[in-house]
């Protein structure tokens, strides 16, 4: 048996390959074959090289998983898929109750019938969630900084500076299963499949990615000034922001459409799309059995 390791060298601020090498401490019952994900041209061809006894292990972060689930959309992986977190945020890993450098686990149940989002006429599969508002702005600024410097990106600093000086709130229409809600002065409007995004923020603390109804949750933070928003913002890391009912609302549904009155950056699992005026996210349609998470050595 071989563990076929798909690693992203750019994950974890460029330490993806070195972090993936740590798998040798966990996967001791078979051979380890490493593949640079950025060099794979066709997953259909790659899957044909796998044998029935192989296990595919993805080593990367949330963006790595997003690329994998979208690059393999419509394909069936012939072997089990495991995951080992080597990213900087690791929101999916955190949602599973795992910690950095925990052993890899099988994630097949979490990749089935994923929610989809349509942006600018293109459909994407969504693992964690879609960020729209100042969170999308932060990803766009972070991308620019990453392109010009090797330093670690401080998204908290970007968010604070954005709140105070650069990002202007928008007016939005949020339509949940056909019911429209008008929202003025919107700072955040993410729709989530899991609980976490943005490196530990928890906009929808009650969202369950395997809920039997297949629903997703949208959180809107709006109607507040800069300083009030800045005071509320830190509580999003604990999920306590939802108690601020005069500033935060959460709706749950199968189809959620968010429209802004001007183009704003959007991010899907950390991957940025600029100049977006609306998106539509559809939840899962198939009921799933909740898996028991087990890892190497457990």
Where are these regions (language model features)?
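Short glycine-/acidic-enriched loop or helix-start segments at secondary-structure transitions
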Residues: 16, 67-70, 92-94, 137, ...
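ATP/NTP phosphate-donor binding region
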Residues: 1-59, 66, 70-75, 98
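Gly/Ser/Thr-rich active-site loops/lids in small-molecule metabolic enzymes
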Residues: 146-157, 199-227
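A generic structural signal for short beta-strands and their flanking turns/coil linkers
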Residues: 170, 185, 212-217, 254-256
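Flexible, charged surface loops at secondary-structure boundaries
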Residues: 48-52, 181-184, 250-252, 259
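Glycine-rich phosphate/pyrophosphate-binding beta-alpha loops
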Residues: 131, 135, 188-204
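Catalytic core of DAGKc-family lipid kinases
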Residues: 6, 37, 74-187
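ATP/nucleoside-binding phosphotransfer catalytic cores, i.e., glycine-rich phosphate-binding loops
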Residues: 178, 210, 220-298
